[in-house]
Amino acid sequence: MPNDINKLKRIMRQANYLTNQSPANGNKAYAMRVAWEIEKIREYLRSGLVSFSYAKVNGDCRTALGTTNPLLIPATAIPKSTDLDLPRERLGLITYYDLDKDGWRSFYFYSLDRIDHVWTFNSPSTTPSTTPAGSLS
């Protein structure tokens, strides 16, 4: 139950922030929908590996293989903090560990193009399950 409350707090904080940002421009329903989508992306990243594409700030398209699951990140790359979110999640920003670049990267939610696949891991010894995720719309 406490995890559900924390999840709802994160979503409401995100929606409140997004309400006054472009492209929501005051549309609370749109901001809430986007906040739920951001939470879904973060859950995918916490559960295993995610293959996705987004537009970089310079306009280039970037395809990435990322995670925030501590079991899949090298021990030297895990931030030394007491926060459960690795690293601290900022409003409107999705942070992930890039397995191709061996480093932490981030992108703004509105630049996400698509999620190609999600591989989830229940424990380090299990075989991953794969889910084609498709578009978020």
Describe the function of each predicted region.
Residues 46-54:
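A short, Trp-centered hydrophobic/proline-enriched beta-strand micro-motif
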Residues 25-40, 65, 69-82:
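Charged, amphipathic alpha-helical segments
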Residues 93, 97-130:
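Short, compact, well-ordered microdomains
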Residues 2-23, 31, 35:
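Amphipathic alpha-helical segments in structured regions that serve as interaction surfaces
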Residues 85-87, 129-137:
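Nucleic-acid endonuclease domains
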